[in-house]
């Protein structure tokens, strides 16, 4: 309801397959409740684009539903298989979504290594694609690498886990 401004998502394929808007199947309407300027997310995505770092597209919108004004929103491209296909050579890789915010309770998506039991990761992350394969080994491997590598091994092996040039661009921008 307009008095309780909530973020929401439009899924063009929810009821009819193969619908899209500008080749996007989903759009996220973010209420920016923690950003009174409404600028942080948009500026970060624009800076990322300017630095050739893959990032979702973002625009501003005044949103009306059935003639009623609902508010001002950031409209953001969904990070999904379509996004991966557009921005990466190997789009068949897994895409994980972090669950709870860092530090929120005992199941925070904190990139800590919790061993090899997938169940310990399923309460912190969700697999957003390749659900049939249900292969969590890459997430388990990267958390093990981050938390248990020696400094020398970390430096020597970083490029196997991360696209270092893109990562450095992101950190600089």
Question: Where are the language model's segments positioned?
Answer:
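Short active-site-adjacent helix-start/loop capping segments
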Residues: 18-19, 37
